[in-house]
């Protein structure tokens, strides 16, 4: 018999799945359960009914996993904030959870053989700083009473919160949330930034326009041996250790040498392009491609005077298809958005004939799909590292090295 929304059922929880869920089954129906752990027996409340599957929240734990802990945040509960998926999971178990998701996607979507995945040694590494107080950029939604808060899972409903424990301490101290008495009339969201150089910015967002109410519209970040100027609303990694960790990993995998030519695709403010330029030197060449106006502006401010760096303002797909970037290339960095690079970009990159590609990914599924396309072009995934850039959440960052087979 089928179950309905808001109905409660007892479930034995199975393996982890993408999205911060575990898989369970009830009367032949697949149920994706939040706030649960593999092997647990839980009472789950059905939250969504779809053709072919259901969604549910574990509202009571009957038999707990040894990896279960008490969430440090009072809002990381069923029906409340949807930001942190894994606060009920011990930190070491969170790393295993994410590695299991990565492995499953490589099997299912990349279609890599099990021995090949075993050889990669798939694991997720913790970054310095612990699991709380790491998020240097937080965007709060604003409710109908003008209070800033966070969204429920898969909902536009705002949960007014007194504090966000994963936010950087400098952000936690800001009088932004409802506990401080702050109200934000006419604002759709409040954006906060705490940079690595100690700068703090608060902006309101309405109708697609950001208005700075505290600090400056640009902040400075220090990473990869450089000082970067970045618009407050432009993309920059949210974990304080992320930029250095990713840059070091990309350089180690690619091993650039003086005189080589490199492409930095989806280059943003220029983090990887700057690091590559330092390695290939004045006799080398680095071409950065970025479509976001703020990213292009930042890249030109940061790297405009760096010898051998060319900045192309265009969508990566367009730049490749219309041959706005041409000539021999030795190395490529791909750092696409969550949707991945896509088949057309992968085919164009492999056709250009580089000796190696470093792929930086924030979504294991998109990464795995692109790895499959690389394989169809005669390339292989030669190395893979995973990093926990987003503790307490389902998200994981990957850096893969792809080379001609």
Predicted ranges, named:
Residues 1-334, 339-347, 353:
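Accessory RNA-recognition modules of RNA-modification enzymes
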Residues 145, 403-405:
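Short loop segments at secondary-structure junctions
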Residues 312-396, 403:
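S-adenosylmethionine
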């Amino acid at each position: 018999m089928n179950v309905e929304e808001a109905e409660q059922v007892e479930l034995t929880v199975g393996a982890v799945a993408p999205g911060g869920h575990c898989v369970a089954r009830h009367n032949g129906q697949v149920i994706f359960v939040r706030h649960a752990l593999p092997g647990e027996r839980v009472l789950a409340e059905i939250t969504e009914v779809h053709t072919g599957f259901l969604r549910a929240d574990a509202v009571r734990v009957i038999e707990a996993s040894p990896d279960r802990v008490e969430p440090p945040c009072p809002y990381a509960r069923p029906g409340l904030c949807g930001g942190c998926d894994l606060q009920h999971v011990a930190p070491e178990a969170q790393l295993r959870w994410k590695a299991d998701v990565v492995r499953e996607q490589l099997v299912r979507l990349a279609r890599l053989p099990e021995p090949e995945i075993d050889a990669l040694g798939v694991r997720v590494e913790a970054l310095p700083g612990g699991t709380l107080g790491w998020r240097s950029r937080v965007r709060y939604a604003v409710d109908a009473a003008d209070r800033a808060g966070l969204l429920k899972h898969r909902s536009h409903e705002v949960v007014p919160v007194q504090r966000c424990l994963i936010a950087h301490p400098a952000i936690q101290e800001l009088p932004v949330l409802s506990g401080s008495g702050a109200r934000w009339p006419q604002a759709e969201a409040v954006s906060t930034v705490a940079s690595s150089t100690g700068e703090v910015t608060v902006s309101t967002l309405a109708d697609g326009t950001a208005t700075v109410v505290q600090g400056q519209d640009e902040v400075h970040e220090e990473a990869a041996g450089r000082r970067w100027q970045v618009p407050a609303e432009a993309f920059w990694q949210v974990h304080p250790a992320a930029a250095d960790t990713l840059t070091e990993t990309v350089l180690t995998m690619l091993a650039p040498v003086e005189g080589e030519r490199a492409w930095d695709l989806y280059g943003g403010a220029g983090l990887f392009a700057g690091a590559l330029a330092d390695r290939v030197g004045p006799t080398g060449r680095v071409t950065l491609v970025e479509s976001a106006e703020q990213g292009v502006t930042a890249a030109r401010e940061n790297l405009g005077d760096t010898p051998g760096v060319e900045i192309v303002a265009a969508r990566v797909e367009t730049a490749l298809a219309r041959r706005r970037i041409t000539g021999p290339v030795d190395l490529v960095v791909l750092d696409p958005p969550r949707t991945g690079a896509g088949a057309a970009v992968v085919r164009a990159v492999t056709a250009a004939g580089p000796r190696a590609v470093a792929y930086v990914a924030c979504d294991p599924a998109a990464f795995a799909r692109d790895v499959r396309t690389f394989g169809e072009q005669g390339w292989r995934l030669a190395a893979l590292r995973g990093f926990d850039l987003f503790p307490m959440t389902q998200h994981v960052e990957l850096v893969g090295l792809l080379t001609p087979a």
